[in-house]
Amino acid sequence: MTLALRSIDAENYARIVLPLTAPLWAAGRDFESYTRQTLELARSGYGRTHYSTIGLYDGALLCASCKCYEREIRLGDRTLKAIGIGAVFTPDELRGRGYASAMLAALMDREHAVGSDALYLFSDIAPAFYEALGFVAFPSRVFSFRSDDLPHARMSIKQATPEDRAAIRRLFSRHERSRPWSLKRTPLYWEWIYLRTRHGSEHPGDDALTFVLREGSRVDAFVTGVRSAAHDSFIVDEIGIRDERERDLIAPFLRSAAGDLRRIVGWLPPEPIRRMLPRGTIRRRKDAIFMVAPLTRAAHAWVRSASGAGSGDAVWSTDHI
């Protein structure tokens, strides 16, 4: 048996792998839509330059596959190169033979050789599987509070327009720069997020909404999420505020964004937004657990200091892959 990593181009990935993964990840989409949207992502600006699909082969036999996403980590004044791993898959008839582990180990070796600092992923299974390969779990939590427990204030919130995007990006970037580290967002990655949002990748069946609190042409706050009638909840993806001294705006702003839904929920956001949230229930996530495998000395030092630091989580739900 000779195992080897090979690239799979987007069309062959759609032809060979997607029919197998659709029951897991099509999320209610018909197969035609699932395939079309996957190819659209691969052909996007970010997809053409920073996204790839690979397989572990034994001769001509595809034993396992995954998606790779190139990102950069801002660590103070330094930049680390990271590779996100998603859609780790082994065909049913080949499971239990260690192919997924072999693929990830080979990928770690390859990326270390070309100068990458770390791999990361979001685990939907017990972290022990990935910990055995060298991944470290970061705190991964969700928050929840009742809408009726939040103060009500008369405020005129509006749905964001495309003209608001630049202001929203500035607010988001301001918060991210105040953190010790964060995943960088390039213009191409922002476009990738917008495309995945239009696809409903994270919230199938619900329309994503972005609300802004605007003073004239100035955006003072924004929140992105979905109003999910099925869960009777407003699910928050991202939130930002122009002036942290106005943090008392956040609670009534979220209540207004929730409309008549009973609860407001979401991934626990990173600092500084985490400390501005109203008091509520916080619990560990059972899925999408953020994990990092450091490959270099700099990445090992970062993971040691960051994996248990701070009261907020490490990443936003929009970073999920």
Model-derived features: positions:
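Short amphipathic alpha-helix that is part of the acyltransferase structural core
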Residues: 1-70, 80, 84, 151-192, ...
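Core nucleotidyl-transferase/polymerase catalytic module
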Residues: 48, 63, 69, 86, ...
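Conserved beta-strand in the GNAT
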Residues: 53-55, 61-71, 84-89, 212, ...
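A short, internal acetyl-CoA/4′-phosphopantetheine-binding micro-motif in the GNAT/acyltransferase core
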Residues: 85-95, 235-246
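Conserved acetyl-CoA pyrophosphate-binding loop and the N-cap/start of the following alpha-helix
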Residues: 94-106, 244-253
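Conserved GNAT acetyl-CoA-binding A-motif
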Residues: 109-123, 259-270
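Active-site/acyl-donor-binding loops of N-acyltransferases
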Residues: 128, 134-152, 226-229, 236-244, ...
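Amide-forming acyltransferase catalytic core, primarily the GNAT-like/NAT-type
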Residues: 136-238
